[in-house]
UniProtKB/Swiss-Prot annotation:
It is found in: Endoplasmic reticulum membrane. This is Very long chain fatty acid elongase 1. It comes from the Eukaryota. Keywords: Acetylation, Endoplasmic reticulum, Fatty acid biosynthesis, Fatty acid metabolism, Lipid biosynthesis, Lipid metabolism, Membrane, Transferase, Transmembrane, Transmembrane helix.
Length: 279
């Protein structure tokens, strides 16, 4: 326990003062409490509350929620690009700019906004529970939604920006596509003919992790790189690798083995019409 406390104090010594005043950023206690409450609700409290209730439809809410996240994700991508990735960054070894220049402060702001978007996206799982789509609350889903906000909190608390922000920009780009799909599918039958690309969603996720891993792996082959926190490089590389394996496993069991294909397809080998599950 003492080692954990010492590690916490050591990490907080490196906290970036520019982000101290942002909501949720004073201490890790609040974000940790939110995530623990989230896990408790989706794994225990939520299913018990819904056990003897009919599922909520939430169609109107899902349409607004998903298209709002499309807009937010687009804005985050734009801000990352304007905060360095289309101006001063080299896309190779890009250290963190700890100055108070307008561009550096813009990067701090969008890094925080990305973290906030991960908190908002916890609603994905709450929607599953309220609609009694418990089968969609997989280990991969829960792990991804609970680990990323917490790890990103520490990332922006200490090192907002630099080459470590690449994966956040790519993730937001993927979420533009993902929430567009969810929003269209929430519209109902009118949008079904345009959702032929459902199977490619996991492929897009896999491409994301390949890009993240390739970009961050450059660090290991550079003669020198003055990025200030190499530990973040190592963690991002681990993140890309672990989630590539998890999503590859999901792809294999969902589509290669056909576990998520309609029963008619599995039995007869012929196409069947099914509703796409939104969000």
């Amino acid at each position: 326990m003492e080692a954990v406390v010492n590690l916490y104090h050591e990490l907080m010594k490196h906290a970036d003062p520019r982000i101290q005043s942002y909501p949720l950023m004073g201490s890790p206690l609040l974000i940790t409490s939110i995530l623990l409450t989230y896990v408790y609700f989706i794994l225990s409290l939520g299913p018990r509350i819904m056990a003897n209730r009919k599922p909520f439809q939430l169609r109107g809410f899902m349409i607004v929620y998903n298209f709002s996240l499309v807009i937010l994700s687009l804005y985050i991508v734009y801000e990352f690009l304007m905060s360095g990735w289309l101006s001063t960054y080299t896309w190779r070894c890009d250290p963190i700019d700890f100055s108070n220049s307008p561009e550096a402060l813009r990067m701090v702001r969008v890094a925080w906004l990305f973290m906030l978007s991960k908190v908002i996206e916890l609603m994905d799982t709450v929607i599953f529970i309220l609609r009694k789509k418990d089968g969609q609350v997989t280990f991969l889903h829960v792990f991804h939604h609970s680990v990323l906000p917490w790890s990103w909190w520490w990332g922006i608390k200490i090192a907002p920006g630099g080459m470590g922000s690449f994966h956040a920009m790519i993730n937001s780009s993927v979420h533009v596509v993902m929430y567009l799909y969810y929003g269209l599918s929430a519209l109902g039958p009118v949008a079904q003919p345009y959702l032929w690309w459902k199977k490619h969603m996991t492929a897009i996720q896999l491409i994301q992790f390949v890009l993240v891993s390739l970009h961050i792996s450059q660090y290991y082959f550079m003669p020198s790189c003055n990025y200030q926190y190499p530990i973040i490089i190592h963690l991002i590389w681990m993140y890309g690798t672990i989630f590539f394996i998890l999503f590859s496993n999901f792809w294999y069991h969902s589509y290669t083995k056909g576990k998520r294909l309609p029963r008619a397809v599995q039995q007869n080998g012929a196409p069947a019409t099914t509703k796409v599950k939104a969000n």
